[in-house]
Amino acid sequence: MTLYIRRESSKLWKRFCSEISTEIGLLAENWKYLLAGLICQYIHGLAAKGVHYIHRPGPTLQDLGFFLLPELGQERSYISETVFTSVFLSFFLWTFHPFILKTKKIYTVLIWCRVLAFLVACQFLRVITFYSTQLPGPNYHCREGSKVSRLPWPKSALEVLEINPHGVMYGCGDLIFSSHMIFTLVFVRTYQKYGTKRFIKLFGWLTAIVQSLLIIASRKHYSVDVVVAWYTVNLVVFCLDKKLPELPDRTAVLLPVISKDRTKEENHKLLNGNGVDPADWRPRAQVNGKIDSNGVHTDNTMNGA
């Protein structure tokens, strides 16, 4: 048992080191895209904070989702955040599975370049929409009478550039469309294309639907915020996926051609005339019952022979 553990540990360590060297090479080539994506995440956070300064609380708008779904209440608002955190962490860990598992289909650096491109495009559209029209927030801390429904004006430029972690849960004004649904749908669609487990793919879409209902039931967004996110994110990912270069497929490395299959392939080529040198098909002349490979007629009586 100890010998088996040592052998497997050695294999795992070699696999990890090999993957590290591969990913470092990819990181050296693509670090600019990753850095740009992270900077855009920061800018998106600043934009969401900025709209909180100009948010004006008011009566909650009439909403079909609020009418159909019972309100969870402020004490149960953590449920949707728990589901989102589970989705985020699960996807994050999955992108690093090539470092551990033997079967792998993606490169970690390349998959995150692709994911960040999807996120940035969707967030750019989101910033445009929630700055175009500010709706009164339906969340409990955004309603009339709440002390945090509107941020006090900043006293310095440094305060504007600071990102408050609590703004993720206690922001107001950044409604159309839901940022949580952007991340959730991008992650689910990415695994749908590059994942290998069908059960997890189905479970991912089911989780996205449940997440949508929980967001509305928690009164964190209007129904329109969730609906717009569903078709906008899917359309953006669909269009960008056609434009971005496809990731190299790693599964071919795990499927070497065995000798039996190679023999069948060679026989198939021979039957179709593809496995023979084209030079062997050129016309040849017959000389005294013999074939001259150069196609030139030779006479054995020439030169008195």
Curated annotation (Swiss-Prot):
This is Phosphatidylinositol:ceramide inositolphosphotransferase 2. The keyword Lipid metabolism applies. The active site is at H180, H221, D225. Pathway: Sphingolipid metabolism. The chain crosses the membrane at residues 34-54, 81-101, 105-125, 168-188, 198-218, 221-241. It comes from the Eukaryota. GO terms for biological process: defense response; sphingolipid biosynthetic process. Pfam families: PAP2_C. GO terms for molecular function: inositol phosphoceramide synthase activity; phosphotransferase activity, for other substituted phosphate groups. It is found in: Golgi apparatus, trans-Golgi network membrane. Its main location: Golgi. Its EC number is 2.7.1.227. GO terms for cellular component: membrane; trans-Golgi network. The keyword Membrane applies. InterPro entries: Sphingomyelin_synth-like (IPR045221), Sphingomyelin_synth-like_dom (IPR025749). Disruption phenotype: Constitutive RPW8-mediated HR-like cell death characterized by salicylic acid (SA) accumulation, enhanced transcription of RPW8 and RPW8-dependent spontaneous HR-like cell death (SHL) in leaf tissues. Reduced plant stature. Sphingolipid (e.g. ceramides and hydroxyceramides) accumulation associated with a reduced inositol-phosphorylceramide synthase (IPCS) activity.
